[in-house]
């Protein structure tokens, strides 16, 4: 994990900082593996603690690398941007020294939907995101097949970059079993919005999530959402979505998801959705970040 590319990048950054001499350097990633020096303030962005919390998805070596280098990074960090209160809380649990560093929860800034789409229901569930186990794609496939076995009629469309061979095999096998499953691979920004506008509901069965931007995107289309009951989803949606329990064994998780697919609430609270979207609007969050950076 001492990638030559990573160290070369930060060596280049250090040279540029020596030339530019900024007041603040904002690193959009979590770890800065070298001491950048200089008289400027350094701000890092912390997305999650997954390499420590979910070693099974990242491996023991990367988990140790992450923990060691973040501890070193924090010694030279003046400000932290978090993406959620959950991430802040978890970070401070693993790294108590982070509590004494100035911080704000505001960095998630998404682009507004500019094109107008005609909302309709073409009778399909949709998942868009990375195709990996951490995102719960395996649960989605198994839950959907059970949903169909129990009389469900809607189709399932999957979109996103394939990240793991195990998930690839699960998806391919499921498509051979059920012709109502479609995998589109990576989808463009416009295609994604087109799919949002025509779906019955968005399904987001993630097992670990630092934020969940797709949920905010879907709320703009006023469509039902079915997600796992991760605490982060309660934080960002104020509990205004359908959820299924994943705090159980896999057999129960699959049953719970199938139950939700069969009986989810098709009505949405449009006012509650609008309030969530407004909270994460670019203008508002941009001002929060600006005020934080310029407050000292």
Ranges and model annotations:
Residues 1-296:
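Carbohydrate transferase catalytic cores enriched for Leloir-type hexosyltransferases
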